[in-house]
């Protein structure tokens, strides 16, 4: 499941981003990890309460997707039938291009400062959301610490992935699924994606291989 709740387990890393020469101690991480539990959220109508005073609710993982979906709904309410919303990592297309063709959306090559895409996809009226370890990270003694954390350990997720891209109808869903699939790893992520209707994934591994769950969107490296 996707946990929106976080404690200072993630805040510890965020604070350390100011001083990239320091890694939180294991004792710090384990202490804060005790407060990571989505069951601490109580919802009553429009009221949301946390039963753990040391827990924090972090919606950063879905905020851009939520905003993108609202922007698309607004444009459609104004009878705009063609357009593209780009919030950086979240691309949401409205209908198809004015000439009737699909949009070409690039997926960034991890750690490439030039911004060149590693591949492109062809979509219309779809969301394309990417989560990757190259977005926010720092290195200490040659070791990379990224922002996607394993909620069972408190440390950055360890696997062979650099990024996960989700193609779906909803950008908010894409936000949640891209992070979740990254944490799950390729095999379990594929199982999840295959269980969902209208959702596909593109995985970029740490040797820059591209793995897809479908050929539907004409993934191209040219």
Task: Tell me the role of every PLM-derived stretch.
Residues 52, 61-92, 185:
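Cysteine-centered nucleophilic/redox motifs
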Residues 195, 204-222:
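Low-complexity, Gly/Ser/Thr/Pro-rich intrinsically disordered linker/tail segments
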Residues 93-127:
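Hydrophobic/aromatic-rich core segments of domains that either
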Residues 108-112, 126, 133, 153, ...:
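Solvent-exposed coil/turn segments that connect beta secondary-structure elements
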Residues 14-20, 55-62, 163-167, 177-179:
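Second-shell loop/turn segments in exported
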Residues 1-9, 13:
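Single conserved hydrophobic/aromatic residue that forms the stacking wall/gate
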Residues 11-49:
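Secondary-structure boundary elements
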Residues 149-203:
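Proteins synthesized as precursors that undergo proteolytic processing into mature forms
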């Amino acid at each position: 499941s996707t946990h929106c709740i976080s404690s200072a387990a993630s805040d510890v890393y965020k604070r350390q981003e100011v001083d990239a020469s320091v890694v939180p101690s294991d004792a710090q991480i384990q202490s804060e990890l005790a407060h990571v539990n989505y069951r601490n959220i109580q919802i009553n109508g429009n009221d949301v309460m946390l039963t753990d005073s040391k827990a924090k609710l972090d919606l950063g993982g879905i905020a851009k997707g939520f905003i993108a979906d609202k922007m698309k709904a607004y444009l459609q309410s104004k009878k705009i039938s063609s357009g593209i919303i780009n919030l950086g990592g979240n691309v949401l297309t409205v209908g198809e291009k004015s000439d009737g063709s699909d949009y070409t959306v690039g997926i960034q090559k991890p750690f490439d400062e030039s911004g060149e895409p590693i591949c492109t996809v062809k979509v219309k009226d779809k969301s394309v959301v990417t989560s990757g370890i190259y977005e926010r990270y720092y290195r200490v003694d040659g070791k990379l610490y990224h922002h996607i954390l394993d909620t069972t350990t408190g440390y950055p997720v360890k696997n062979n992935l650099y990024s996960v891209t989700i193609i779906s109808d909803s950008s908010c869903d894409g936000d949640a699924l891209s992070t979740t699939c990254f944490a799950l790893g390729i095999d379990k992520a594929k199982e999840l994606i295959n269980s969902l209707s209208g959702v596909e994934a593109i995985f970029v591994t740490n040797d820059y291989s591209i793995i897809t769950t479908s050929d539907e969107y004409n993934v191209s490296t040219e």
